[in-house]
Amino acid sequence: MKTIGIICEYNPFHNGHAYQLHTLAQQHPDTLRICIMSGSFVQRGEPAIFSKFDRARWAVLGGADIIIELPTIYSTGSAQLFGTGAVRMVKALAIDALSFGSETADLNALINIAKHMDCESTQAQLRTYINEGMSYGTAFRKALHTEILNTPNALLGLEYIRAGLAYNPKLQYIPILRTSNHHEESITNELPSGTALRQLITSAGNLSYQSITSTGNLSSQCITSTGNLSSQLQSTIPPSIASDMIQVVDNGNYVNYNRYHDMVHSLSRRTTPKELDKFGDFNEGIEHLWSKAAQQSSWTAATEEIKSKRYTYARLQRMGAYLTLGITKDVLQNAMEEGPQYARLLAFNDRGRQWLRNKYEIPLIQKWAKAPNELSTLGQTMHHIDTLATDIQALCFHNESNRIGHKDYTYTPQYIK
């Protein structure tokens, strides 16, 4: 085994991620650690809190050797689409093994469950439960008679194995036992959840940045907030990246989610039900309820009106991303059938340099501007959506000077020595 793939989002990178990479380095010291990372948008159906360029740099500083971007079509997809796209990229890049966080380290149990996911009886029960109004995850949990699927990441782990069985039978799996609760909202230890960190950065960072820009000076409240943020980040982020991340927050180079939500809400108001119907996941007449809810005072209020067991908040978020990025049902279907059309290099270190010289099933892109010339029609669509995702994310940054478009075209893969 020469290479291990890690499918990740690093939204943001923290001690839990460093723990996984460190564990792999100890267990497989001579093996390259290649991360397939969500880019400007993540599976929650919204922009990542930091740019993919910052997150890729931090990942290498935190123990990864190579960072490859997962195209936005997959990174904003359902668990099945996300997992399938990532695993097919792992195969296209000839990566030997796949490591992922899991609520159980019992690999045989996970493989056994994954094998039953596509059985006719399981699929029949799944359809029945979904027709009763259950979410995809809940319906699968009941159809498979297992409680392992009680978190989003547990479902993703099974989707990786499911995709591997279908597209990459020789792929090895290395589950790493999780050390934090996926949705824990408080910073209770040195291994926090991504949710807790995003909330910390958003609340404390908003106060400090807004205070600086509005007054030109730091208020006592702002100083306290900034100090608390710095202290808490330093206890939850690897020392190699803590000061860098704090500087990025201080510069306002992170997402203001209110700006993004207003963008989705505005698009929802100007798009007719007939137009909504062409975008991913708009089925069963929900486009009419969506248009009606768009008259609410905010995107948050609109989702509260639409939300149901079947249409969870996460699913509605993804639908909002499809609308914002112009991702249609046809594009999603083609992406599921054909798989990733390229692998975009974001960052690497000395250990990863040799690997970059190899040839793979899909183009390894280092120069974004030249890429469309060597891509298929679907690849060009993916390229356009990735560019748009970065541009939309940039528009949502706190600092106006960081809202410049087409950053993808000026970015060079980072060589971290």
Located regions from the model:
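Non-catalytic positions within long, well-ordered alpha-helices that form the structural scaffold/packing
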Residues: 26, 60, 90-91
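Acidic, Ser/Thr-rich peripheral helices and adjacent loops at domain boundaries
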Residues: 54-57, 353
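N-terminal catalytic cores of NTP/NDP-binding nucleotidyl/phosphoryl-transfer enzymes
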Residues: 1-55
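A glycine-rich helix N-cap at a beta->alpha junction
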Residues: 61-71
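Active-site cores that bind ATP or allylic diphosphates and position pyrophosphate for catalysis
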Residues: 70-417
